[in-house]
Amino acid sequence: MELQNRNTTRNPERIPVALTIAGSDSGGGAGIQADLRTFSANGVFGTSAITAVTSQNPTAVARVDALPPDAVAEQIRSVLDVIDIRAIKTGMLFSAGIIQRVAECLKPVKLPLVVDPVMISTSGTKLMQDEALEAMMSDFLPLATWITPNIPEAELLAGLTIRSSSDAAAAAEKIADRWQTGVILKGGHAESDRMAADVVCSDGMFCTLATARLHLPPGTSHGTGCTFSAALAAFLAKGENALQAVVAAKAFVLGSLAEARAIGKDRVLAAMFPPEKLETYQKQILISRQ
């Protein structure tokens, strides 16, 4: 029996799309790889512009090869020209030249922009050149909708030492005021053994989001910052409001850590893995408004 060849046209259902501008992580735990995995897990189509190729695994960075700034800009333009992007996130931008070209591409674009100011890897390798910090602060952060620094990054941006929750609150407010943007200061690097608390400051909203701190195998926390900022961009692309998107992003990271999978060859080594039920972890977040 022959199958009939029917010439039919189907209008595909629209899906939200996000763009990540970041470095490639050969180990798969962070960078572009983590971003695209996070987009997909949350029902968002992912596009990308690669800024650098890193040779790394969850425990060490062996090498960083930055792309030419023009090559990064061309990737961004190619995506924005024809694809209906709903939100953008940036990660590792590495050099002043790349930062300036990315800023030129994004200035005309009126979309939610999540900036993860990546400076140092989990293993301690510098992922931003010294002269790039000034370009980040002068040319790029003014474009951000959200900035998502960890504690060491927030100390550099705010010019403050963070040793307590009140220090974190002061730093978040200072960053938000300086760049007129939302700030989520991530508390994963804090010294507390019990809780991981993030400070959220945006348009008069000030609160903390706290969860019990998980004690996990080596390598598991690699890529948490990338995953958080990508999840935030994904939920913004889907139209969630600010607080809903932030809470969902934190829940996604918590779930990814709690449901980590073993990937090591000859040692205990684990990596984050997207959670099956996000709502399970949203219920574990304590929200304190101030």
Across the structure, where does each feature detected by a protein language model lie?
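Conserved phosphate/ATP/ADP-binding segment of small-molecule kinases
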Residues: D130-F206
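Charged C-terminal helix
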Residues: I15, R63-A66, L243-Q290
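Short, small-residue alpha-helix embedded
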Residues: T38, E155-L156, P218-A242
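Conserved N-terminal subdomain of the carbohydrate kinase-like
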Residues: E2-T20, L36-S123, P275-L278, I287
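Acidic-glycine-rich active-site phosphate/pyrophosphate-binding loop
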Residues: N5-I15, G31, R194-T211
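Short pre-catalytic strand/loop immediately N-terminal to key active-site residues, enriched for Gly-Thr
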Residues: P16-V17, I21-G27, C207-H222
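Short, well-structured alpha-helical segments that form the helix of a local strand-helix-strand
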Residues: A168-A176, A210, N241-L257
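Phosphate-handling active-site elements
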Residues: N42-T47, F206-C207, F235-A249
